Amino acid sequence: MAKQSMKAREVKRVALADKYFAKRAELKAIISDVNATDEDRWNAVLKLQTLPRDSSPSRQRNRCRQTGRPHAFLRKFGLSRIKVREAAMRGEIPGLKKASW
């Protein structure tokens, strides 16, 4: 199990990313606009750097819904490989069965 503080930190990152999404997209559009002046583009870079670090979506980490485990996360189920295996062995995931060949 992940520490509660790590789970809370991840929730905070998601909230910050949602809050600053529009502003971040606006600044990135200015930066990538070739018709904008160099001064405007540089000012946009500086403003982007002043935004909170955790407001960047790339700082988010997928975590298991049950345990908070950050590694071996399966997007299809929203769980770590360990919890997917446990649920599959109990027959709780429809259509999923153990491979045999």
Curated annotation (Swiss-Prot):
Protein's name according to its UniProt entry: Small ribosomal subunit protein uS14
HAMAP family per record: Ribosomal_uS14_1
Entry superkingdom: Bacteria
Family listed: Belongs to the universal ribosomal protein uS14 family.
Source taxonomy: Bacteria, Pseudomonadati, Pseudomonadota, Gammaproteobacteria, Enterobacterales
SUPFAM superfamilies: Glucocorticoid receptor-like (DNA-binding domain) (SSF57716)
Biological function: Binds 16S rRNA, required for the assembly of 30S particles and may also be responsible for determining the conformation of the 16S rRNA at the A site.
Gene name of the record: rpsN
GO cellular component term of the entry, any: small ribosomal subunit
Keyword RNA-binding (UniProt): yes
Sorted UniProt keywords: Ribonucleoprotein, Ribosomal protein, RNA-binding, rRNA-binding
Species: Salmonella typhimurium (strain LT2 / SGSC1412 / ATCC 700720)
Assembly: Part of the 30S ribosomal subunit. Contacts proteins S3 and S10.
